[in-house]
Amino acid sequence: MASGSRTKHSHQSGQGQVQAQSSGTSNVNYKDSISKAIAQYTADARLHAVFEQSGESGKSFDYSQSIKTTTQSVVPEQQITAYLTKIQRGGHIQPFGCMIAVDEASFRVIAYSENACEMLSLTPQSVPSLERPEILTVGTDVRTLFTPSSSVLLERAFGAREITLLNPIWIHSKNSGKPFYAILHRVDVGIVIDLEPARTEDPALSIAGAVQSQKLAVRAISHLQSLPGGDVKLLCDTVVESVRELTGYDRVMVYKFHEDEHGEVVAESKIPDLEPYIGLHYPATDIPQASRFLFKQNRVRMIVDCHATPVRVVQDESLMQPLCLVGSTLRAPHGCHAQYMANMGSIASLTLAVIINGNDEEAVGGRSSMRLWGLVVGHHTSARCIPFPLRYACEFLMQAFGLQLNMELQLASQLSEKHVLRTQTLLCDMLLRDSPTGIVIQSPSIMDLVKCDGAALYCQGKYYPLGVTPTEAQIKDIVEWLLTYHGDSTGLSTDSLADAGYPGAALLGDAVCGMAVAYITSKDFLFWFRSHTAKEIKWGGAKHHPEDKDDGQRMHPRSSFKAFLEVVKSRSLPWENAEMDAIHSLLILRDSFKDAEASNSKAVVHAQLGEMELQGIDELSSVAREMVRLIETATAPIFAVDVEGRINGWNAKVAELTDLSVEEAMGKSLVHDLVHKESQETAEKLLFNALRGEEDKNVEIKLRTFGPEQLKKAVFVVVNACSSKDYTNNIVGVCFVGQDVTGQKVVMDKFIHIQGDYKAIVHSPNPLIPPIFASDENTCCSEWNTAMEKLTGWSRGEIIGKMLVGEIFGSCCRLKGPDAMTKFMIVLHNAIGVQDTDKFPFSFFDRNGKYVQALLTANKRVNMEGQIIGAFCFIQIASPELQQALRVQRQQEKKCYSQMKELAYLCQEIKSPLNGIRFTNSLLEATDLTENQKQYLETSAACERQMSKIIRDVDLENIEDGSLTLEKEEFFLGSVIDAVVSQVMLLLRERSVQLIRDIPEEIKTLTVHGDQVRIQQVLADFLLNMVRYAPSPDGWVEIQLQPNMKQISDEVTVVHIEFRIVCPGEGLPPELVQDMFHSSRWVTKEGLGLSMCRKILKLMNGDIQYIRESERCYFLIILDLPMTRRGSKSLG
C-alpha cells in the first residue's frame, strides 16, 4: 500500500536526497509531501488493478500479498488515468436515491440513473394518456417532471452563483406528488441533481426539521467550544460522542492522517458489542489519494448499504467522457471499499472530512491552503440513511471542529517550538562553553530535542552514547560510510538504514532502524536513533485467532493492521518535518566552531544589521507621529490610560461626546470617574485583560457625560482595547479605539421591547437607524430594512422569506468560505435560543462584489407575551476614520514586531562573534606582549564584557523597575577610563573632534569595588552622545575626573568621584534631554539609551546632571565607590 511511497522516500533520503539545512526545510518538506502523494497514487492504481483482475479471473483478492507487490512494480500512466476515471466517473450511483444531469442553459436532460423513472413514478403505465407519455429520456425538459412550484424553485437555483448554498431544494414529482430533497451541484457539462426521497410532504416541516438539525449541531459546537484548551485528545473524544448522538451510528471514529500518509484511529465511541478499533494504524492505501481528494471536494459522504446493487447512469452519447460524480451525494462506492465494509461487518457508513489550514508553502494566489487532517467516520451494522439536513448539520459541526482543532494544533506547535528552542539554546551553550560531553550527560540532553530511542555525540574520535545506540565499532563504521557516500552534505535522515544503503544495517537489528545525523564539523557528528515502528504501535483491538487462516487475505481492519506492520518492518517512525527543523538548527554550531578558530570577521555584518535596525526605528517613529495625528483628528472616540487606569490620552471626539475637555479628563480614573456604574465591571475586566496582553474586541461600555444634560443622556461606545507597549515590548498602558453607538443602542432597546411604532422606526431613512434584519424561528428572513437594502444592494422583496444561512448570506451576499457561514449560523441560532451575541465580526460581499466589514449584534425577538419568535440582527459599520486608524495601528504593530524580531535575532547571532573575540583574546594572552599591547588587550576584553552583559540583560523592565542585579568586583578605575575612551575614538576621528583628558595620574592605579561593566556602559554612552553633538570640525570634548576620599569607618573608605564631560556650543538637542530626564515614552533612540543609563546610575546610588552654560554644556556624573586598602593607599 503506502509502502511504495515510503520505501522510495526513505531510499532517497538515504541515498542522496539529504535533508536540507533549516533555512530551506519547509520548501523541501512541501515538495516531499507532493512526491509522497504522487507515489501513493501509483500504489493505489496498482492495488486497484490487482483487485479488478482478481474479480475478472474469479480468483480471491489476497489483500496483504497485494500490498507487498505494489511496492515492486511500475504502473503505466494509462493505468493511473484509468484508475482515476473509475474513481471519479464510475457511472453508477447508490439506489437509495436517483440522479438527473441537466444542461444548464436549456434544462435538457443529458444523463439520468436507471431507477429515476421508477422513483419519480414516470413509467408509461402511470400516465393516463399514452399519446404523449412523460417518460424520462435524454433530451427531456427536466421542468416537466416536477410540479410547477418545484420548477420555479429549480429555475431560481439554476440562476444562483453558488448553487450548492441553496441545498436542499424541496421539490415534488409531478406524477406522484412525492417529495424529494434536490441536492444540486455544477459539473463540467451542466448541473447534477441528486434526488433523495423525503419523509414528509409538508415543506414547512422540512424547514423546521433542517433548523432542528442545525440547532442540534450548534449545541454540539457549543460543547466543543466550552472544552478546556490544550487537549486534542479530549476534543476528538467529544466530537465522536457528539456525532454518534446526532446520527445514531453504532460506531464513530476519528481517523488521523500522519505525515507519511498512513492513518491512525485516535478516538472512538461505540456500542458495547463491537470490537474496539482505537489505536489501529493502517497503510496509506486503505484510503487512496483519489478518495482523499474527493473528501476535500465533497466533505460529507454517506454509504447507505454496501450490499445494495449500484444503479447504472445512462447518459447522452454526445458527451465526451463519463459524467463526473465527484460532488454527487449518491456516488456508488468502489467494489473494493464495499467488500472491505462487508468484511468488517459495517453495512452503512458516514464519512465527514476534517479540514484545517495547510502550510504557507501550499497556498496559491495569496489564499491560505486547506489540508485534510483526517476523517470522522460512522459505521453501522445495518443499512442506515441519514436525511440531508442532518448531514448538512454534521458538516457544520465538522467545520467548527476543524477550526477548534486548528487552534489546538497551533498552540501545541508553539509550545513544542518553545521547548525545542529552549533545548537548542542550552545544548549550544553546553557545546560552546563546557565539555562536549555535557550534551549527553547533563540535562537536558540531545535526546530531549526530538523523540528518539538513543542519541550520541562523536567528537574528535571519541564516542559518547546515550540510550539505545550502536556500539563504538558500529558507529565508526557508520561515520566512515557517511564520509564516503555523503561527505559533501550537512546531514542525513532515514527511517530505514537498510534502504538508505548502509551495508551493516542487518547487524543493527530492530534496535536501530532509523537515524538522523547532523555534521557539526568534518570530524564531529550528532546522531539520533530510532527502533523499529512495531515497538511503538499498539492496537486496542482483539488479536486474531491462529485458526483464522484467511485473516491476512481478506480486507479487514485487522489485516490492514497486519499489512501496516509488514510495511514498516525494519523501519522506524519517520522523522517529522518539525523534528528535522530542530536538528538542522543545531548546524549553527558549525559556524560557531569555525568562529572559535578565527577572529571577529562577522562584526562588520552585524554592524550593518545594526544600521538597518536604527533605520527601521526612524521609520517606526515616523509612523508613530502619523498615528498621533490621526488619533487627535479622528471622528471616532479614542482614549488611553496608563498602567494605573488613569487617562493619559483623550481625543477631540470623545471630549465632544462626554462634554469633558482634554485638560479635565487627564489623570482621572477611567473606571471610577468616567464610566457608568453598570459598565464598571466590564471596564475593569477590559483593562485587566489588556494590561496582561489580552486585547478584547468590540466591547460596549457606557460613559458618563458632564454637560448640563448629564442626567438625561448617556454615551455608549463600542471599543477595541489595544495594549500600549514600549520598545522592549513591555505593556505601559492601554489605548481604546471606539465607535459611538448611542443612537443605535436606543433604537435597539426599542426593538427588543417592541416599543413605539415598529415599522416606522425600522424603515426610517434616518442615518441613525442602523442596517437591521430579522429572523423567524426557522432562520428565514422576516425583516430587511431600508439601511440593509442600501448596504447590500438587495431589495426587501428579493430577500424576505429566504433562509438567512446559505441562501441570503452565502448565495446573495457571499461569505468568505464555509467557516464564516458556520460562525454566522451559530450566532443566529444562539440568539433564537436566548443567548445574545454582541459585536460579532461579520464580513460579506454586497451585490456589486464590494467587501463589507461590519459588526453583528444578534438579540432574541419576543412577542407581547414574552415568547421568543426569532432574532433581531443589527449591523454596525466602522467609520472610514476608525478603519484608517486601525490600519495605521496594525502597521505600527507589524513594524514593532519586525523590530523585536530583528533585536532578538541580533542578540542571538552576535553571541558567536563575541565568543570568537573572547577566544582570540585568550590566545593573545598566552603570547609575549609589550605593556602597551597588554593594555590594548585589556581594553578589548573590557569592551567585549560590556557588550556581552548588554545582550544578556536586554530586558529593560528590570532596569525600569529597579530590579537589575549589579555585580560587585574589584577593578582599576583607569581600565574603565581606557575602555570608555576606546569606544569613541573612531567617532572622534570621523568628526575631527579633539579629546582632552584632565585625569589625575593616580587614577590609573586606583582600585575600587562595583559593577565595572555597568559603570563602563554608563560613562561610554554619555561620552558618545557628547562627542556626537560637539561642534565639528575643530571642536573638542573634555573629560574631567576629580576623586575625593571619604572615611566612612575604620575599615570602609569611599571615593567620591565627579566626572565632567564638557563640550562647547549648544550641546545636546532639547528632545534628547527630555527623553533622558522626563519622558516615559522615548522619541529618539539616543534618548532611550541615555534614559536607561541614568536609571542604571541611580541603581548604583549615583546622580547625573546636564548643565547648559552660555558657551558650553556638560554632564556632571557623581558616583561613590568603596575602595580597597590598596586603592586608598594609591590615592593617598
From Swiss-Prot:
The PTM entry states: Contains one covalently linked phytochromobilin chromophore.
> What Pfam family does this protein match (any one)?
HATPase_c
Assigned keywords, A-Z: Chromophore, Photoreceptor protein, Receptor, Repeat, Sensory transduction, Transcription, Transcription regulation
Entry-linked InterPro entries: GAF (IPR003018), GAF-like_dom_sf (IPR029016), HATPase_C_sf (IPR036890), His_kinase_dom (IPR005467), HisK_dim/P_dom (IPR003661), HisK_dim/P_sf (IPR036097), PAS (IPR000014), PAS-like_dom_sf (IPR035965)
Q: Where are the transmembrane segments?
A: none
Low complexity: compositionally biased ranges: 12-26
Task: Give yes or no: UniProt keyword Transcription regulation.
Answer: yes
Which PROSITE patterns did the record assign? HIS_KIN (PS50109), PAS (PS50112), PHYTOCHROME_1 (PS00245), PHYTOCHROME_2 (PS50046)
Q: Does the keyword Transcription apply?
A: yes
Q: Which residues form the Histidine kinase domain?
A: 905-1125
Signal peptide region: none
UniProt GO MF annotations:
phosphorelay sensor kinase activity; photoreceptor activity; protein homodimerization activity
Q: Which GO terms describe its biological process?
A: detection of visible light; red, far-red light phototransduction; regulation of DNA-templated transcription
Q: Where is the composition biased (Basic residues)?
A: 1-11
- In this chain the GAF domain maps to 231-409
GO cellular component labels: nucleus
Disordered: where is this region? 1-27
Q: Domain named PAS: which ranges?
A: 623-694, 757-828
What family does the entry list? Belongs to the phytochrome family.
Q: Which NCBIfam families match?
A: sensory_box (TIGR00229)
Function text: Regulatory photoreceptor which exists in two forms that are reversibly interconvertible by light: the Pr form that absorbs maximally in the red region of the spectrum and the Pfr form that absorbs maximally in the far-red region. Photoconversion of Pr to Pfr induces an array of morphogenic responses, whereas reconversion of Pfr to Pr cancels the induction of those responses. Pfr controls the expression of a number of nuclear genes including those encoding the small subunit of ribulose-bisphosphate carboxylase, chlorophyll A/B binding protein, protochlorophyllide reductase, rRNA, etc.
Q: Assembly and interactions? A: Homodimer.
| Protein's name according to its UniProt entry | Phytochrome B
Which species does this protein come from?
Nicotiana tabacum
User: What are the leading ranks of the lineage?
Assistant: Eukaryota, Viridiplantae, Streptophyta, Embryophyta, Tracheophyta
- What gene makes this protein? PHYB
